[in-house]
């Protein structure tokens, strides 16, 4: 694959009783399918973690109010990847549309252009 010029971030919460199937489908189906889409450089999942950091000379606890628990970060060659036929097929394949997507909420989708190498 080519050089990542954009980052697409999909974030969401999931109903607690569907968390196990959410994680299984995301790891074993959804991410592997999207990684095969032309123009996708990488795809990685993450989960919100507690944050303490130095700000203004003191350690502060940062509370991310309303921030979704789960995110996936996709490095893309260009934003056209997101409107490609291959992307459309990948995001609607497997168990994701029927067994996972209906149980997600607080969904956020953002696209960011990378500005340095």
Regions found by a protein language model. Give the residues of each.
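Macromolecular interaction modules
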Residues: 1-117
């Amino acid at each position: 694959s080519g050089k990542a010029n954009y980052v697409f971030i999909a974030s969401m919460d999931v109903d607690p009783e569907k968390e196990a199937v959410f994680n299984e489908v995301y790891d074993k189906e959804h991410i592997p399918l999207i990684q095969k889409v032309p123009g996708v450089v990488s795809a990685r999942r993450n989960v919100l973690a507690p944050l303490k950091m130095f700000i203004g000379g003191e350690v502060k606890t940062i509370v991310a109010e309303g921030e979704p628990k789960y995110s996936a970060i996709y490095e893309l060659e260009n934003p056209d990847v997101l409107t490609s036929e291959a992307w459309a097929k990948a995001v609607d394949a497997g168990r994701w549309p029927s067994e996972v997507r209906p149980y997600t909420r607080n969904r956020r989708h953002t696209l960011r252009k990378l500005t340095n190498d």
